[in-house]
C-alpha cells in the first residue's frame, strides 16, 4: 500500500471506530462466534491471537472460552474501544505483525482482516511462526467479490476483493500449515441489497 492509501486507510478506521459497533455489519458479525467457536478446540489453558481484532467482535467472546487473548490491530482508535470494555484476560497490542511477535500462541483467529493486507503469503508465514507446534489457524473472510462490498475500496484500505479460498489454502500450505480445509461459514446482508458469503479457512501449524 502506498503512503497516500495507507494514510487514507488509517483515517477511515479512526473515523469508523465510533460508529463501527452500531453498524448492521458489526451486529451481524456478532453472531459469527456462534458458528465459528464450535469448530475450534478451545480451553482455559490456551492463549489465542486475534489478528485484526478491531473493537473485539471475536476477542470478547473468545475470552470467555480460553485463558488469554491478545487482540492485535494497527488501529489505535479501534483498540481503544476494545480497551474500554475492560475484559481482564484480553491484552491489547497495537503492532504491525510483519515486525514479528515475541509470544507463541495456541491459536490464531481472524475475521474480515485479511482483505486489508497486501502481502498474504508473508502474513501467513508470520502467523505460522507465531503459533506453537500444532497450534490452530482460523481465518474468516469474504469469498471473491466484485468490489461492491466496500464501495470505496482504496479509501477503506482494501487490498483484495475477497479471496478464492482454494488459492488461499495453497498459500497457507506453502507457509507451513497442515490439515488445511475451508468451508462456507456465514452470510452478510449488505445495505446494497446483496448477500455476501464468508468462508472459514482452518489448519494447524
Outline where the language-model segments fall.
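Short catalytic micro-motifs in class I SAM-dependent methyltransferases
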Residues: 112-113
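Conserved class I S-adenosyl-L-methionine
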Residues: 1-41, 58, 78-81
Amino acid at each position: 500500500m502506498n503512503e497516500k492509501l495507507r494514510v487514507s486507510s488509517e483515517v477511515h478506521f479512526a473515523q469508523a471506530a465510533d460508529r463501527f459497533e452500531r453498524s448492521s455489519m458489526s451486529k451481524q458479525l456478532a453472531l459469527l462466534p456462534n458458528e465459528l467457536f464450535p469448530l475450534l478446540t478451545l480451553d482455559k489453558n490456551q492463549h489465542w491471537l486475534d489478528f485484526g481484532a478491531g473493537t473485539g467482535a471475536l476477542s470478547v467472546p473468545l475470552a470467555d472460552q480460553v485463558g488469554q487473548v491478545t487482540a492485535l490491530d494497527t488501529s489505535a482508535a479501534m483498540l481503544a474501544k476494545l480497551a474500554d470494555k475492560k475484559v481482564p484476560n484480553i491484552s491489547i497490542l497495537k503492532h504491525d505483525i510483519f515486525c514479528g511477535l515475541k509470544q507463541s500462541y495456541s491459536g490464531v483467529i481472524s475475521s474480515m482482516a485479511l482483505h486489508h493486507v497486501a502481502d498474504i503469503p508473508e502474513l501467513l508465514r508470520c502467523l505460522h511462526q507465531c503459533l506453537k507446534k500444532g497450534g490452530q489457524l482460523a481465518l474468516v473472510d469474504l469469498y471473491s467479490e466484485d468490489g461492491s462490498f466496500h464501495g470505496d475500496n482504496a479509501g477503506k484500505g482494501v487490498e483484495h476483493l475477497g479471496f478464492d479460498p482454494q488459492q488461499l489454502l495453497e498459500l497457507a500450505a506453502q507457509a507451513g500449515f497442515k490439515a488445511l480445509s475451508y468451508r462456507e461459514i456465514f452470510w452478510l446482508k449488505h445495505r446494497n441489497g446483496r448477500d455476501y458469503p464468508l468462508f472459514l479457512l482452518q489448519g494447524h501449524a
